[in-house]
Amino acid sequence: MGRVLDLGAGNGIMGQVMKDYGVARMIGADIIPEAKKACIRDSPGVYDEYYVADFTNLKPELIEEISEWSVDCLTTVAALGFGDIPTKAFLQALKFVQTGGWVAFNIKETFLNNSDTSGFSRLIRELIFSEYLDLYHLERYRHRLSMEGIPLYYYAIVAEKKSDIPEDFLKTFKIDE
């Protein structure tokens, strides 16, 4: 793994873990300016660059700048499926990953259930059962306990990007952006 884009980077916890595992080049991205401030405070120097940007509406110059990083891995932890990162933003970040690169993220277990018809749930199911991603690892784990003490389960997902995702992917599958 050479260059990682950490979407929803927050205060840099994931970046710090990746750095501890020897990842040398990392980019953080979050829509919230306070997240970057928290990262500078809590995890200084972890990211080579940290973008505060709306990935649903990136300016062409920023698309070009991020593309020049030749990202070969996308990570997103505890930020998908609750409206924190919209489907369009996640798909945009995934487009930055080079073919043959990796994507690693976690999602609440119900997002893989066919009864969940939310846009994000449908996006993930369409992607992991498509020619665009090759599922490498899927693991259910207890993410945390609810305030009532009930276990909340998530899936950790790792997949290889096999080909570019078409611009009209969301429209083709009638997925809300």
Region spans (language model):
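Short "lid" loop at the C-terminus of a central beta-strand within the Rossmann-like core
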Residues: 56, 108-113
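Conserved beta-strand signature within the Rossmann-like core of class I S-adenosyl-L-methionine
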Residues: 100-108
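A short acidic, Gly/Pro-enriched loop at the edge of an enzyme's catalytic core
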Residues: 61-74
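A short glycine-rich, Lys/Arg-flanked "PGG" loop and its adjoining helix->strand segment in the class I
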Residues: 88-99
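Class I SAM-dependent methyltransferase SAM/SAH-binding core
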Residues: 5, 11-62
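Short alpha-helix
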Residues: 115-131
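Class I S-adenosyl-L-methionine
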Residues: 129-177
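A short SAM/SAH-binding and catalytic strip from SAM-dependent methyltransferases
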Residues: 71-86
